[in-house]
Amino acid sequence: MSRRLILILVLVAMLVKTMAGMESKWVETTYEIKKRSGTSEKERESERLLGVVNPLIKCFRSPCPGRRAISEQT
């Protein structure tokens, strides 16, 4: 019985120590990330839009993966 009690106490102590270590970690907020980065919000937004639009442009220029070209369908 005493071995089981000691084991439980050790496990609880390890759990408490782990939880305390996790809470002490510094978490960076999105505001701090924006402040740290040198690019403005407009630049980031335009890069995000280009990342979405570029695959669509490529898809219109050449057939999308899994699709045949219009000339092949006729």
Curated annotation (Swiss-Prot):
Sites of the modification Proline amide? Answer: P65
Q: Where in the cell is it found?
A: Secreted; Target cell membrane
For the biological process aspect of GO, one term held by this record is: defense response to fungus
List the signal peptide residues: 1-21
Which residues get removed as pro-piece?
22-33, 69-74
Q: What is its main location?
A: secreted
As annotated in Swiss-Prot or TrEMBL, what is the tissue specificity of this protein? Answer: Expressed by the venom gland.
Assigned GO CC terms? extracellular region; membrane; other organism cell membrane
Q: Keyword annotations for this protein? A: Amidation, Antibiotic, Antimicrobial, Cleavage on pair of basic residues, Cytolysis, Fungicide, Membrane, Secreted, Signal, Target cell membrane, Target membrane
Q: Does the keyword Iron apply?
A: no
By sequence similarity, the record places it as follows: Belongs to the non-disulfide-bridged peptide (NDBP) superfamily. Medium-length antimicrobial peptide (group 3) family.
Q: Relate the protein's function as given in its record.
A: Possesses antimicrobial activity against both Gram-negative and Gram-positive bacteria, as well as against the fungus C.tropicalis. Also possesses a relatively high hemolytic activity. May act by disrupting the integrity of the bacterial cell membrane.
The protein's name? Antimicrobial peptide HsAp2
Source organism lineage?
Eukaryota, Metazoa, Ecdysozoa, Arthropoda, Chelicerata
